[in-house]
From Swiss-Prot:
GO molecular function, one term: cysteine-type peptidase activity
Key word Transmembrane present: no
Active site: 295, 431, 451
Family: Belongs to the peptidase C1 family.
Gene this protein is translated from: CTSF
Tissues/organs with expression: High expression levels in heart, skeletal muscle, brain, testis and ovary; moderate levels in prostate, placenta, liver and colon; and no detectable expression in peripheral leukocytes and thymus.
Name of the protein in question: Cathepsin F
Length: 484
């Protein structure tokens, strides 16, 4: 492994490099009451995943269950605790040594999207070894002091992204000794600000440990960012990296080829020094995709809204729900591609407005009515990967649908983001957004990006990314509808 990759792996910043903190258990499981009926289906699914690959006679049996659910629309995230009974095993073909019957205490996290279950986490151990707090990461509040220090927010723009360019960041003063008290206070403010409720003390304790790990991770991202961005507490700070990626991002963007689009005609590379379609009436308000990986739909409707405004003179807020329900080439909350969405709009005969076909945040039956369609598109085009030409196209033609690597966005607060290229690879794009403008802040060039995570994220719902360096793959999947 290259030296800089070894360092980034040590810092826990490469995808999947750090496991999420395990969820703590409650020892007094005998006192659990009957489970809510809605917990049974996700629990059975988790049990099925637990037993997958096990020989007959060795499969565990479900015992007691408890848990909680967090909802958005019909998307549900279940945090479950269950006891499992493992049968004794005396078959030498299956077990090397005889194994007596034992009880396991497990925690599972299951995502349910219209009955489709995904197991996000499985953590099990014998009951007698699971005591309150045992699942928490060792020294959760101070693990950062052993690996990375209280790092300065400003540092040189090191273009040579190697081991030597970041190793000095490990040699600063350690984190303060009163960090646990500070973190508890910050977490309390987070809970109040974002109206979080947790089912039990164990769940709250576990979310606190996730929060602390996330703050350490945000500090590392802050230290290695070459822009002016500030990272820290956001509404996603109590979600593990895996939860965040599964619920809000769109890995289909890097896995599926999508429909082939023709290349857009060049408008040249002469662009005004700055441009912002928000101030010119071509951009609707920031929307919120909720617990649904539907960023692709919001990116496309935002582009079509702008194209319709520029060519027809009317700004309409268009329906993402129509695409979730009626675009059969894409996968609704499980992800999609802008190129497929353009084809779906064209084949359907247009888009209805948000008022007529409102967003639900989950897939339902297609209720598109051609009579209610307010806009149409004639075609779609792929744009240049040259950022100067992209800026010129945007200034002349309107907002652009793009896809980016969302590294660091879970903790983004404000400023111009510029992660190191190895951390924000252009080949690992997983989030679709909308370019609405560009400019400079204190001589730092940026793209102004409309996101779909609500106005309580980022700069009132907007993300600012470095322009001119191909940051996070912003130039790799740019496209637009064509409205004549």
């Amino acid at each position: 492994m290259a030296p800089w990759l070894q360092l980034l792996s040590l810092l826990g910043l490469l995808p999947g490099a750090v496991a999420a903190p395990a969820q703590p258990r409650a020892a007094s499981f005998q006192a659990w009451g009957p489970p809510s009926p809605e917990l049974l289906a996700p629990t059975r699914f988790a049990l099925e995943m637990f037993n997958r690959g096990r020989a007959a006679g060795t499969r565990a049996v479900l015992g007691l269950v408890r848990g909680r659910v967090r909802r958005a629309g019909q998307g549900s995230l279940y945090s479950l605790e269950a006891t499992l009974e493992e049968p004794p095993c005396n078959d030498p073909m299956v077990c090397r040594l005889p194994v007596s019957k034992k009880t396991l205490l497990c925690s599972f996290q299951v995502l349910d999207e219209l009955g489709r279950h995904v197991l996000l986490r499985k953590d099990c151990g014998p009951v007698d070894t699971k005591v309150p707090g045992a699942g928490e990461p060792k020294s959760a509040f101070t693990q950062g002091s052993a690996m990375i220090s209280s790092l300065s927010q400003n540092h040189p723009d090191n273009r040579n992204e190697t081991f030597s360019s970041v190793i000095s960041l490990l040699n600063e003063d350690p984190l303060s000794q009163d960090l646990p008290v500070k973190m508890a206070s910050i977490f309390k403010n987070f809970v109040i600000t974002y109206n979080r409720t947790y089912e039990s003390k164990e769940e709250a304790r576990w979310r606190l440990s996730v929060f602390v790990n996330n703050m350490v991770r945000a500090q590392k991202i802050q230290a290695l960012d070459r822009g002016t961005a500030q990272y820290g507490v956001t509404k996603f700070s109590d979600l593990t990296e895996e939860e965040f990626r599964t619920i809000y991002l769109n890995t289909l963007l890097r896995k599926e080829p999508g429909n082939k689009m023709k290349q857009a005609k060049s408008v040249g590379d002469l662009a005004p020094p700055e441009w912002d379609w928000r101030s010119k009436g071509a951009v609707t308000k920031v929307k919120d995709q909720g617990m649904c990986g539907s960023c692709w739909a919001f990116s496309v409707t935002g582009n079509v809204e702008g194209q319709w405004f520029l060519n027809q003179g009317t700004l309409l807020s268009l329906s993402e729900q129509e695409l979730l329900d009626c675009d059969k080439m894409d996968k609704a909350c499980m992800g999609g591609l802008p190129s497929n969405a353009y084809s779906a709009i064209k084949n359907l005969g247009g888009l209805e407005t948000e008022d007529d076909y409102s967003y639900q945040g989950h897939m339902q039956s297609c209720n598109f009515s051609a009579e209610k369609a307010k806009v149409y598109i004639n075609d779609s085009v792929e744009l240049s990967q040259n950022e100067q030409k992209l800026a010129a196209w945007l200034a002349k033609r309107g907002p652009i649908s793009v896809a980016i690597n969302a590294f660091g966005m879970q903790f983004y607060r404000h400023g111009i983001s510029r992660p190191l290229r190895p951390l924000c690879s252009p080949w690992l794009i997983d989030h679709a957004v909308l370019l609405v403008g560009y400019g400079n802040r204190s001589d730092v060039p940026f793209w102004a990006i409309k996101n779909s995570w609500g106005t309580d994220w980022g700069e009132k719902g907007y993300y600012y990314l470095h322009r001119g360096s191909g940051a996070c793959g912003v130039n790799t999947m740019a496209s637009s509808a064509v409205v004549d």
